[in-house]
Amino acid sequence: MKKRVIIIGGGVAGMQTALRLAEQGVSPVIIEKEAELGGKLRGWHVLFPSFTPASEILTELRRRIAERGIEVMTRTEARGFSREGVQLPDGRMLACDSVVVCSGFT
């Protein structure tokens, strides 16, 4: 049975973590509080020093997430986590083997 890992945060770190876990045969689930994946990258124009448009990077990451069939839960926050899993605001508990916090920065 595949291990299930909940990733809290759907920014670049969360998406990259999910992709790496999927490559290792793990079943990742991304929980993102916003309506779409991307985190701070959604508000950036270009990346330094290459001046690659941020939208290109974001589009590619989202494509790879979808291609891998990684479960994504947007507009969802984690209220807490324990040995049983991650608790959602509606009281549901998402069972998992591990939790990775990729909550980003402000």
Could you describe each region identified by the protein language model?
Residues 1-8, 66-106:
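FAD-binding core/adjacent interface of flavoenzyme oxidoreductases
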Residues 3-68:
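Beta1-alpha1 glycine-rich phosphate/pyrophosphate-binding loop at the start
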